[in-house]
Amino acid sequence: LYEEAELADERRFEEWLSLFTDDLQYRMPIVRSLAANDIGKEYLTGPLDISWVDEGKPTLAMRVQQLRTGVHWAEEPLSRVTRLITNVRIVEALPSAEEAQEVEASCKFLLYRNRNADNQDTIIGKRVDRMRRAGDSWLIARRTVFLNQPVLLVNTLSFFV
């Protein structure tokens, strides 16, 4: 997870893409502010619910291609992004911890983005990643990003969260 964040920070997007499975599901569900007794329903995570982001690897690859053209209006010049990853925990290992072929990990993140002279954004939240063994390494098969804010306060989502 740290390597993945560093590759994205360094704009090495093609290498970054190689850390995801071909059947990747990358989601950022919308969060709602609800009463305390409805707290378990605050994130819209159902298959038909709307999300800020709901993409697969082909869509991420197209976004990388757009960035590389140099004419992507929302990312020209490219943003400078720093991702801080912390509180990484293994939540589940299948079929067992000793013989894991799939692992679910959660972490907290802070993303800082600067573009041009005075455009800056900060995003904080939690990520849940399902990783799948691929030989001697692990690939991310599913990522769900849970933002801590019900209103998206960034000007654009042209960068990768």
Positions of predicted regions on the chain:
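Short, aromatic-enriched amphipathic alpha-helices that serve as compact interaction elements
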Residues: 1-9
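Hydrophobic pocket/interface hotspot
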Residues: 4, 16, 60, 131
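A solvent-exposed, acidic/Ser-Thr-rich amphipathic alpha-helical stretch
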Residues: 22-105
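Beta-strand elements of well-folded, non-transmembrane domains
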Residues: 90, 109-113, 130-133
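Short beta-strand edge/turn micro-motifs at domain boundaries
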Residues: 98-106, 123-156
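Short, cysteine-centered beta-strand-loop-beta hairpins and adjacent loop/turn segments enriched
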Residues: 111-121
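Short hydrophobic/aromatic patches at helix-to-coil boundaries
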Residues: 158-161
